[in-house]
């Protein structure tokens, strides 16, 4: 079974090219593949397939709203094997892989996901690196009735803004938090939040106030733990940073441990632009894969 390994600002993925959606992906198999000691190691798995094939194979019960049968489909799994709706860094790496492998020749095309269609623009790409923008759709804030959202990260309590970017986020901006304090925070430790507010779990971002157009952010992803970057999380972070400044739209650079991305929020949608790197291509032992599925 062939694979590729790639990352977007060090949020890393194993890509499995499976256009007919014939590959059996179990939670146990995905978790083993993502394990950094007994597998290849990754924050998640991206199955590269077509939307119609995914629906015909039962990967999807139906095509997500707005996704056409002839669109590409990103079947994304978290490192714990759970199915995820969306991954902004993953979409960029997915689009890069399509171009680098010759499966796609256009600069602009649509990548389908459980969260719906995600139009992408490949500004530049070669076999190793790419610069990709993704139309992430409109990011919606939750709790308009004045509901308070809080989380504990690294033993510290933060208030946050709940944001839906196709998946749930709690973006916690602390105006008193310095860049050095953020760097020292134990984001990898178990987090806590109100499970009644987020029954399916939540991705939690901790961020500084913007300075010179830059927000510093770290993230604890549901089903994974701390990652070096989270694309949808950077969108949520910019929504929160703009809201704290009394704005609904704008552009900010988000600096995560894995690098920089640029997020633009408009009245109608949001855009995520950043790098993708394809690191390796190889083949997974069929015997190992069959054992890992159990």
From Swiss-Prot:
Enzyme class: isomerase
GO-annotated biological processes: lysine biosynthetic process via diaminopimelate
Molecular function GO labels: diaminopimelate epimerase activity
Pfam family, one: DAP_epimerase
Cellular compartments annotated: Cytoplasm
Primary subcellular site in the record, as a coarse category: cytoplasm
Cellular component aspect of the GO annotation: cytosol
Entry binding sites for substrate: 11, 78, 88-89, 167, 203, 221-222, 231-232
Sections of the chain in a coiled coil: none
Keywords: Amino-acid biosynthesis, Cytoplasm, Isomerase, Lysine biosynthesis
Pathway(s) this gene product operates in, as recorded in its UniProt entry: Amino-acid biosynthesis; L-lysine biosynthesis via DAP pathway; DL-2,6-diaminopimelate from LL-2,6-diaminopimelate: step 1/1
Could be important to modulate the pK values of the two catalytic cysteine residues, annotated site positions: 169, 221
Reactions performed catalytically: (2S,6S)-2,6-diaminopimelate = meso-2,6-diaminopimelate
Entry's EC annotation: 5.1.1.7
InterPro entries for the chain: DAP_epimerase_AS (IPR018510), DAP_epimerase_DapF (IPR001653)
Residues at the active site: 87 (proton donor), 230 (proton acceptor)
Family statement: Belongs to the diaminopimelate epimerase family.
Record-linked NCBIfam families: DapF
Complex and partners: Homodimer.
Role of this protein: Catalyzes the stereoinversion of LL-2,6-diaminopimelate (L,L-DAP) to meso-diaminopimelate (meso-DAP), a precursor of L-lysine and an essential component of the bacterial peptidoglycan.
Record-given protein name: Diaminopimelate epimerase
């Amino acid at each position: 079974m062939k694979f590729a390994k790639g990352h977007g600002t060090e949020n890393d993925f194993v890509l499995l090219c499976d256009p007919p959606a014939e590959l059996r992906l179990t939670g146990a198999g995905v978790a083993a593949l993502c394990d950094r000691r007994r597998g290849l190691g990754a924050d998640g798995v991206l199955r590269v397939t077509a939307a119609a094939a995914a629906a015909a194979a039962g990967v999807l019960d139906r095509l997500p709203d707005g996704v056409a049968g002839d669109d590409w489909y990103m079947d994304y799994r978290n490192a714990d094997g759970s199915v995820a709706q969306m991954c902004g860094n993953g979409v960029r790496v997915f689009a890069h892989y399509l171009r680098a492998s010759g499966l796609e020749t256009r600069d602009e095309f649509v990548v389908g996901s459980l969260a719906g269609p995600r139009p992408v623009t490949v500004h530049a790409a070669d076999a190793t690196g790419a610069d990709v923008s993704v139309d992430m759709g409109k990011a919606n804030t939750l709790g308009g009735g004045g509901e308070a959202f809080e989380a504990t990260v690294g033993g510290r309590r933060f208030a946050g803004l709940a944001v839906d970017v196709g998946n749930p986020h709690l973006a916690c901006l602390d105006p008193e938090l310095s860049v050095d304090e953020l760097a020292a925070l134990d984001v990898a430790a178990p987090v806590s939040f109100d499970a009644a507010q987020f029954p399916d779990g939540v991705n939690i971002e901790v961020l500084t106030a913007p300075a010179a157009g830059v927000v510093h952010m770290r993230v604890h992803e549901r089903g994974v733990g701390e990652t070096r970057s989270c694309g949808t999380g950077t969108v949520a972070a910019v929504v929160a940073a703009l809201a704290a400044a009394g704005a609904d739209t704008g552009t900010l650079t988000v600096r995560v441990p894995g690098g920089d991305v640029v997020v633009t929020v408009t009245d109608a949608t949001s855009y995520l632009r950043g790098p993708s790197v394809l690191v390796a291509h190889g083949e997974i032992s069929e015997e190992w894969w069959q054992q890992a599925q159990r």
